[in-house]
């Protein structure tokens, strides 16, 4: 007999992408997986793993981890370019903070959603800034 399941990864990634698209209203492309050569700025979401937190007969709780990358390229990056990057960093972090709990398309909930670490990787010669976050969220699924 086949198992019934929800594609939690797809639901979580779609919700996260929709949060970004709603907030930035088309000004910041968002890609899941490999980002094509997408221009001067974009966000890339890459699933990296999950950890089982609680397992019992009626459900399981997992913590999902997603690598979030903000890419910004500007030739001859000056102070204004860095200001732009830091404004986006702060706005993205505020967006995630304001959505610590969200409902997925299957009506299940994500909770304890947060950005745990952030790393700013400037490449002054290439005029590129890459900002990486480790996004984590918890989900209870396989409820019977």
Predicted regions and their residues:
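A short, hydrophobic beta-strand-centered structural micro-motif
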Residues: 40-48
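Short, charge-patterned binding micro-sites
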Residues: 37
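Charged, amphipathic alpha-helical segments and their flanking helix caps
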Residues: 1-34, 49-144
């Amino acid at each position: 007999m086949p198992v019934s399941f929800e594609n939690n990864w797809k639901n979580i990634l779609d919700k996260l992408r929709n949060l970004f698209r709603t907030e930035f209203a088309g000004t910041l492309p968002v890609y899941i997986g490999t980002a094509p050569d997408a221009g001067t700025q974009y966000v890339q979401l890459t699933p990296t793993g999950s950890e089982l937190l609680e397992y019992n007969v009626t459900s399981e709780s997992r913590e999902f981890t997603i690598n979030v990358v903000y890419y910004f390229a500007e030739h001859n990056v000056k102070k204004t370019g860095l200001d732009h990057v830091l404004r986006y960093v702060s706005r993205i972090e505020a967006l995630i903070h304001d959505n610590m709990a969200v409902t997925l398309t299957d009506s299940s909930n994500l909770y304890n959603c947060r950005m745990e670490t952030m790393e700013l990787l400037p490449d002054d010669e290439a005029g590129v800034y890459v900002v990486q976050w480790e996004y984590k969220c918890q989900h209870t699924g396989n409820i019977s």
